UniProtKB/Swiss-Prot annotation:
This is Zinc finger protein 114. The gene is ZNF114. GO terms for molecular function: DNA-binding transcription factor activity, RNA polymerase II-specific; identical protein binding; RNA polymerase II cis-regulatory region sequence-specific DNA binding; zinc ion binding. One of its GO terms (biological process) is regulation of DNA-templated transcription. The keyword Cell cycle does not apply. Keywords: DNA-binding, Metal-binding, Nucleus, Repeat, Transcription, Transcription regulation, Zinc, Zinc-finger. Belongs to the krueppel C2H2-type zinc-finger protein family. InterPro entries: KRAB, KRAB_dom_sf, Znf_C2H2_sf, Znf_C2H2_type. A zinc finger (C2H2-type) spans 304-326, 332-354, 361-382, 388-410. Residues 95-116, 280-301 are annotated as: Disordered. GO terms for cellular component: extracellular exosome; nucleus. Residues 6-85 form the KRAB domain.
Length: 417
């Protein structure tokens, strides 16, 4: 039993304008690539008029001159001038009917019946003016392609053997809307497939890439960190934000930070967590002299107590600083005015007054010596002037700090429920 030939109507997919608007860009690109693929392959094996003998059955054209309704047309790249340009270069001397040469300089095929069939529908006396290379083979795709075909050439006889899957033979055209019911297999994002690319092998051991399994939705460009895949390299570059998203890498605890401050904070947390683990496991602390104080801090026990008042501290240094209160020791003395202080911090704060206030202001009313910057604020205390007024309740204040403190009371007020 002979196999039926494949026409373009068997593999074409048509969308209405309404259906086309429902497709996303990825689906539109997939549709365009599949239709261009089918048109190229069918134009490759197409011929104008099949070679006829007295017993041969005329075969229909694979690419019929079909006109689609205006409502079902979809704007695609024109392929007729690129992939279907054929010319009458071949003639059979018995029938004197022209044969057109397909793309890539491959001679037009004729449909061959099975071995036990008769009559033979192949013209055996092809005398071609142009001789192609002796061997041409189209390797079929291993994925879900629309059709699989093997085109062979032996001397001057051409054979075309279409091979269709069972599921592919059940596709029927819906006459109501002019749309071919066709199931597209979508591959999930980041999932690997076993689909391979089809290739065209020439006689000079050259391999030309034909397709990348675009009819199954397989993505060629994949981004490993999150498993997200993209069909086009440009989409991958636009998506390539993982490298610049977080610049600072915290390698010890495998966290990432956006700036140095967070990085330093993570370092402190990591160190504290490590020290806590050392205390629980009994490991020796890196700071041996303070290992006892560190252990008491982790356990919450204050081991250093003041003999005078009984106050306890975590660290011995805190206890030594506290003891100065009981002894009355003030070792830090100002060299300009002779005033003594218990802590160096207080002395440094006192020295700023001598440096900044070279010419202090003395109030004429009360004789108080104040800084020049606080002169006008002090004068308002004598005049009673209150230039700062609350817009909510109308209360006046002599200092801006008093107004700011008052405004917080309005923010804390809750409306009546």
């Amino acid at each position: 039993m002979s196999q039926d030939s494949v026409t373009f109507a068997d593999v074409a997919v048509n969308f209405t304008k309404e259906e086309w608007t429902l497709l996303d860009p990825a689906q539109r690109n997939l549709y365009r690539d599949v239709m261009l693929e089918n048109s190229r392959n069918l134009a490759f094996i197409d011929w104008a008029t099949p070679c006829k003998t007295k017993d041969a059955t005329p075969q229909p054209d694979i690419l019929p001159k079909r006109t689609f309704p205006e409502a079902n047309r979809v704007c695609l790249t024109s392929i007729s001038s690129q992939h279907s340009t054929l010319r009458e270069d071949w003639r059979c001397p018995k029938t004197e009917e022209p044969h057109r040469q397909g793309v890539n300089n491959v001679k037009p095929p004729a449909v061959a019946p099975e071995k036990d069939e008769s009559p033979v529908s192949i013209c055996e006396d092809h005398e071609m003016r142009n001789h192609s290379k002796p061997t041409c083979r189209l390797v079929p795709s291993q994925g879900d392609s629309i059709r699989q075909c093997i085109l062979t050439r032996d001397s001057s006889i051409f054979k075309y053997n279409p091979v269709l899957n069972d599921s592919q033979k059940t596709h029927e055209n819906n006459e109501d809307d002019g749309v071919l019911g066709w199931n597209i297999q979508w591959v999930p994002c980041g999932r690997k497939t076993e689909l391979k690319s089809s290739t065209w092998t020439g006689s000079q051991n050259t391999v030309h890439h034909i397709r990348d399994e675009i009819d199954t939705g397989a993505n060629r460009h994949q981004r490993n960190p999150f498993g997200k895949a993209f069909r086009e390299d440009g989409s991958l570059r636009a998506h390539n934000t993982h490298g610049r998203e977080k610049m600072y890498d915290f390698t010890q605890c495998e966290n990432t930070s956006r700036n140095n401050s967070i990085h330093a904070m993570q370092m402190q947390l990591y160190t504290a967590e490590t020290n806590k683990k050392d205390c629980q496991t009994g490991a020796t602390s890196a700071n041996a002299p303070n290992s006892g104080s560190h252990k008491s801090h982790c356990t919450g026990e204050k081991t250093h107590k003041c003999p005078e008042c009984g106050r306890a501290f975590f660290y011995q240094s805190f206890l030594m600083r506290h003891m100065k209160i009981h002894t009355g020791e003030k070792p830090y003395e100002c060299g300009k005015c002779g005033k003594a202080f218990r802590y160096s911090l207080h002395l440094n704060k006192h020295l700023r007054k001598h440096v900044v206030q070279k010419k202090p202001y003395e109030c004429e009313e009360c004789g108080k010596v104040i800084r020049e910057s606080s002169k006008y604020t002090h004068i308002r205390s004598h005049t009673g002037e209150k230039p700062y007024k609350c817009k909510t309740c109308g209360k006046d204040f002599a200092k801006s700090s008093g107004l700011k403190k008052h405004l917080k009371t309005h923010k804390d007020e809750k409306p009546c429920e």
